Amino acid sequence: RCCDINHLEKRYRSGGESSGIVSVVTDPATSSTKPRVLSCMQPTGDVHLGNYLGALQPWVAGQDRNDAFHGIVDLHALTVTDKPGVVGQAAVELAAMFFAVGLNPDVATVFLQSHVPEHNQLGWVMECTISFGELSRMTQFKDKSAKREQDFISGGLFSYPALQAADILLYDTNQVPVGDDQRQHIEIT
């Protein structure tokens, strides 16, 4: 289930057999009979108490009863930052936090989105099948682009729902817990 990602391995593990980060998609035909749950987090800032109580703690509590997939969605993070160079380091730190709070890579699958090429591949297919009108109606794009202080608004922010739909479809998930701000994106999927 896991592969060696050197920069994570060197920084956060002193030994062991795997880094806990996957780079390949699991075949649903050979996976568990437990419900598959996909939950992801962007590496865009410090993990706070709300992240811990609302996401990380439930992830740890559910990892034994679910076929749990937890992603560090660094490609999504690129849509909302004007400093893309910091996303890589933030992803490493978020992975360390995942493991520090108790996510067990022997039980749950943890992946770094940019290391799974199928995210971009299926994301492109989704961009080509979701209409411009559907994407234009996404309230999260309107909200986030209105809050930008700079003139630059990423095209990736506009097509974000297509990549999120690809994330979900790629892992053939049964459950995708999201907040209200993501509900429209799930409906596209």
Show which residues each predicted segment covers.
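Thr-Gly-centered strand-to-loop micro-motif
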Residues: 172
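Short, positively charged and aromatic/hydrophobic N-terminal segments
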Residues: 12, 17-22
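Short hydrophobic targeting helices and cationic amphipathic motifs
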Residues: 7-8
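N-terminal Rossmann-like or analogous alpha/beta NTP/dinucleotide-binding catalytic cores
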Residues: 23-166, 186
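Hydrophobic alpha-helical membrane context
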Residues: 16-18, 60, 86, 179
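Glycine-rich, Lys/Arg-enriched anion-binding loops that position phosphate/diphosphate groups
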Residues: 175-189
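Cysteine-centered motifs
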Residues: 2-3
